[in-house]
Curated annotation (Swiss-Prot):
It is an enzyme of class 5 (isomerase). One of its GO terms (biological process) is tRNA pseudouridine synthesis. Coiled coil: none annotated. Its EC number is 5.4.99.12. Belongs to the tRNA pseudouridine synthase TruA family. This is tRNA pseudouridine synthase A. Pfam families: PseudoU_synth_1 (PF01416). CDD domains: PseudoU_synth_EcTruA. The lineage of its organism: Bacteria, Pseudomonadati, Spirochaetota, Spirochaetia, Spirochaetales. HAMAP family: TruA (MF_00171). The gene is truA. It comes from Treponema denticola (strain ATCC 35405 / DSM 14222 / CIP 103919 / JCM 8153 / KCTC 15104). Homodimer. GO terms for molecular function: RNA binding; tRNA pseudouridine(38-40) synthase activity.
């Protein structure tokens, strides 16, 4: 995209409840949106403010039913548009209640939310026990047994460094390279939930849910770290376990180079 000197780059941090969305990415047919998406709703709100179409770039494409605590989105607008900080109240007054803008800032014109992200962190929430409260169901995976957290972390320790993650990619994944650099993969307890947190430079389609489903399945059958490592090294999705349901998954945070988060000095 060619950047005009009369434009500024705005970075939004948004949170959304993915329950009633067909994912992040807008889906159009003959110019009309065919399904309700987060990107579609956000661009409609931005277009209403600016009186002309505004295109956005998201840091990642969450699937239907997947949530975000801190999705990062950038867009360009006229340099004379409202101050960056004013986009928070302006957008929140227009957007549906299942999307909230948490922060808005002017950043370097070189920043692209997707291509300049250094890392992305996801969290997957699991609630263990006989039953759960009704209001928890859209935001967690309920399992009746209590997994062995030490065993889960022993297997998850295989997820470190540069890895070919083909075994955990969905059939429709179109990534040219299946290699991803994983910085962290760990299970822990927080507020009575079993949390799986994973941080990597990028992810394959349904990769996190495939990893979670596989690890929980292997723990249930008493498998070992070697069994998980064998699946990883097989590079075959059919060797892995089931895909965990979408509602437990949250896009948690995005990291960018510090220099790209700074606004040009000549603008306000």
């Amino acid at each position: 995209m060619e950047i005009s000197q009369n434009q500024k780059n705005i970075l939004l941090t948004i949170s959304y409840d993915g329950t009633n969305f067909c994912g992040w990415q807008k889906q159009t047919k003959e110019g009309a949106e065919t399904f309700r998406t987060v990107q579609g709703e956000l661009e409609k709100a931005l277009t209403k403010i600016h009186k002309h179409p505004i295109e956005t770039n998201g840091s990642g494409r969450t699937d239907s039913g997947v949530h975000a605590a801190r999705q990062a989105v950038n867009f360009f607008c006229d340099i004379k548009s409202m101050r960056a900080s004013n986009f928070l109240p302006a957008l929140n007054s227009i957007l549906p209640k299942d999307i909230r803008v948490m922060d808005a800032a002017e950043v370097s014109p070189l920043l692209h939310a997707r291509f300049n992200a250094l890392s992305r962190t996801y969290r997957y929430k699991i609630k263990c026990g006989k039953t759960i409260f009704a209001h928890e169901q859209p935001y967690t995976w309920h399992i009746r047994r209590y997994p062995d957290i030490a065993a889960l972390n022993e297997m998850a320790s295989c997820l470190s460094g540069e890895l070919d993650c083909t075994a955990f990619s969905a059939a429709g994944d179109q990534s040219i390279s299946k290699s991803r650099y994983i910085k962290k993969a760990v299970f822990f307890i927080e507020n009575d939930y079993l949390i799986f947190e994973i941080c990597a430079n990028a992810f394959l389609w349904k990769m996190v849910r495939s990893i979670v489903g596989t690890l929980l399945h292997l723990d249930e059958i008493g498998a070992s770290k070697k069994d998980f490592k064998d699946i990883l090294e097989s590079k075959m999705r059919e060797k892995a376990g089931p895909t965990a349901p979408p509602q437990g998954l949250f896009l948690w945070s995005i990291e960018y180079p510090e220099d790209l988060l700074k606004a040009p000095p000549e603008t306000f």
